[in-house]
A protein has these predicted regions:
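Enzymes that bind and transform nitrogen-containing heteroaromatic metabolites
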Residues: 1-221
C-alpha cells in the first residue's frame, strides 16, 4: 500500500510535555539556537511534504518554510476536517511554498470556497468526520511525494501511529520541566490500552546539541 516514508517528530520537555497546560504555543522556539534551527530546517528541506493539524495552525501560526539552510520548500499539508484554517494565517499568505488543505464532508462549502480564494488547493476526504490518513497517503503518493514529515500536534501524531503509518520517529528532549496533568504530550489521542498494542521502536541514533538531546528511532515492523 505505502511506498511513502512517513517521519514523525516533535519537541518535548524532559517530563514529556509539548506545551504548558494553557497550551499557548511556540514555547520551544525561544530555546533554540541557530545551530538547532539549521538541523530542523535541513530536515524540512529533505522531505517532499510537511503535515500538521489545524490545531497547530491555530496555536502557533507557523509558516513551515525552509529558512536557515539552502533547499527546497516542501508542500505544506494541513489536516483540517471543518476548514477552520484562518484566512489570515501565514500558511495561506506565504507564497514560497504551496499549501494543501485536507477537509472532510463536514466542512461547509462557504469555508472551502473561502480557502480556495487564497489560491490553495483543498482536498475533501471521503470520510465524513476525520481525515482518512490512508487515503491521504495514497493521494500524496500519486503526486510522487516520497517522504513526508508530520510535525504535529499530539492528536495528529497519535492518528498516524494508530493507523500504523509511521516509519521513523524523532524526539527533541528539552532540558526543562513543565509539569501539568492536563498539559499536551508528544502523542495524545485515546492511546493504546494493551502493552502488546504499543508501538515498538528501535533507537537508530542520538546526539546532544547544546543541552538538547535528539533521539531518532525507526518503527519496528
Amino acid at each position: 500500500l505505502k511506498n511513502i516514508k512517513v517521519i514523525i517528530g516533535g519537541f518535548m520537555s524532559i517530563d514529556g510535555k509539548t506545551a504548558p497546560a494553557n497550551r499557548i504555543g511556540r514555547i520551544f522556539t525561544k530555546f533554540m539556537t541557530p545551530q538547532h534551527q539549521k538541523i530542523l530546517h535541513r530536515l524540512r528541506a529533505s522531505v517532499d511534504a510537511i503535515i500538521i493539524g489545524v490545531d497547530t495552525v491555530l496555536a502557533d501560526d507557523p509558516s513551515l518554510t525552509v529558512r536557515e539552510v539552502k533547499g527546497k520548500n516542501p508542500i505544506r499539508v494541513v489536516l483540517d476536517s471543518s476548514a477552520r484554517t484562518p484566512l489570515t494565517s501565514r500558511i495561506l499568505n506565504t507564497e514560497e511554498a504551496s499549501t494543501i488543505i485536507v477537509a472532510t464532508q463536514k466542512a461547509s462549502k462557504e469555508k472551502i470556497e473561502a480557502l480556495k480564494s487564497k489560491k490553495v488547493e483543498v482536498i475533501v476526504s471521503s470520510s465524513p468526520e476525520r481525515v482518512d490518513l490512508k487515503e491521504l497517503t495514497e493521494e500524496l503518493k500519486n503526486r510522487e511525494i516520497k517522504k513526508v514529515l508530520v510535525e504535529g500536534g499530539g492528536e495528529v501524531r497519535w492518528s498516524f501511529f494508530k493507523e500504523n503509518l509511521v516509519d521513523e520517529f524523532f524526539v527533541w528532549i528539552m532540558p526543562y520541566v513543565w509539569g501539568g496533568r492536563n498539559a499536551p504530550t508528544l502523542v495524545d489521542g485515546e492511546g493504546f490500552l494493551k502493552t502488546e498494542d504499543a508501538v515498538p521502536l528501535k533507537l537508530k541514533k542520538m546526539k546532544i546539541v547544546k543541552d538538547i538531546l535528539i533521539l531518532w528511532f525507526s518503527v519496528k515492523r
